[in-house]
Amino acid sequence: MTYRIGELASKVGLTERTIRYYEERGLLESVKRLDGGQRVYTDDDVRRLKFIQKLKVLGLSLAEMQELETLYGRHHTNAKVLPRLIELLDAHQRTVNERLSELAALRDEIRAYRQHVSRRLAEAK
């Protein structure tokens, strides 16, 4: 099936501008154009955009996504892409775990300070 950019945008929940931007950044390769220059997208582009959205939710940057696209473009197989994706996901998971530890410490500090302030308030009465 083929889609014009507006149809594709509606289907994947992105703006037309975002789709064009991803194309400019090289995340959408080989987009076909009609004689008038109008872009035409396929189901492969739908899958690619959903994959990009998933990677974005998981915390990957556009530069990291471009790196994966470059690997795929160079080798035309996922054999090199998937191990690198696992490395990136592992790194992001470590970052999330560090942030969770920091947030847990902050939560404990807020709780302790709130108790301190509550005691001071009770003493003042």
Q: Where are each of the predicted segments found?
A:
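Short glycine/proline-centered loop/turn elements that form peptide/ligand docking sites
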Residues: M1, I5-L8, T15-T18, D35
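Glycine-centered, phosphate/nucleic-acid-interacting loop/turn motifs that mediate DNA/RNA or nucleotide
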Residues: G26
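Beta-hairpin "wing" of winged helix-turn-helix
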Residues: E29-G36
